[in-house]
């Protein structure tokens, strides 16, 4: 008998559990009841960006919800039919625009008509994938699966000021399985440093560190100096384009953190992934799992199991008739496979 209500514990996995569960609730029509939302975080319950995701999801499918308020650790979400259209959402802080978009996008791919979604808030938030990651790494894989999505950055928004905006255009699409076992040949690499309202030497020092540690040619290193009205804000982005995928690694500037240390954080992440031999790094792995499950299958290799990946598996299997298996191929490579249950 089809399960009409899915109950989840949101203590493990943080906001990722909530976002995936909202997407799947909209897609399956199953009521979501979730408790202990972000209970293990320093600021438990729904923050502004989580609340925006809930309210946006409710608008897209005409859901009835209870517990949709700041600080709430309990939520009931009863979805209706998904509706495409023209949507605009404002987080009101530097909360992540990209995480709100990723909550809505799977459902809008199944809408009966196209959608345009504008979201204002933070486009470059250290606790979320920046819009560049979606554009360069995630969306190209979604398009390989058949998803028809375009994404534009209209205005940068850093923490704490926010004020950024993105706009997505989504056509109804049927996703097909994707298998990413290998990266293929390296096609190119580059780095760029965004800086707003900060001295020019900050971006220059970050890129110099990339040159020194990764030996990237200087013509592949680009400082991007934004108008100070967007700031203060700084992020270093490292891109590696391979035959089968592109990966992006980020280092966010912080008060009292030297530019060289910002660069080191992104460089260390990139090196760990490059040395592992796995196809996708941990963040892309986590974000490919839901589209693969909706496609009814797929696989990838990634360096290791993470809390987000594990919690995403748990949520997906609670909603969909799929089985997701993870097995180590070596000390540095984990294979993740998604199968539809007959």
From Swiss-Prot:
It comes from Pseudomonas fluorescens (strain ATCC BAA-477 / NRRL B-23932 / Pf-5). One of its GO terms (molecular function) is RNA-3'-phosphate cyclase activity. One of its GO terms (biological process) is RNA processing. It comes from the Bacteria. ATP binds at residues 102, 283-287. Catalyzes the conversion of 3'-phosphate to a 2',3'-cyclic phosphodiester at the end of RNA. The mechanism of action of the enzyme occurs in 3 steps: (A) adenylation of the enzyme by ATP; (B) transfer of adenylate to an RNA-N3'P to produce RNA-N3'PP5'A; (C) and attack of the adjacent 2'-hydroxyl on the 3'-phosphorus in the diester linkage to produce the cyclic end product. The biological role of this enzyme is unknown but it is likely to function in some aspects of cellular RNA processing. It is found in: Cytoplasm. GO terms for cellular component: cytoplasm. This is RNA 3'-terminal phosphate cyclase. Its main location: cytoplasm. It catalyses: a 3'-end 3'-phospho-ribonucleotide-RNA + ATP = a 3'-end 2',3'-cyclophospho-ribonucleotide-RNA + AMP + diphosphate. Belongs to the RNA 3'-terminal cyclase family. Type 1 subfamily. PANTHER family: RNA 3' TERMINAL PHOSPHATE CYCLASE (PTHR11096), RNA 3'-TERMINAL PHOSPHATE CYCLASE (PTHR11096:SF0). The active site is at residue 308. PROSITE patterns: RTC. Its EC number is 6.5.1.4. Pfam families: RTC (PF01137), RTC_insert (PF05189). The keyword Cytoplasm applies. Keywords: ATP-binding, Cytoplasm, Ligase, Nucleotide-binding.
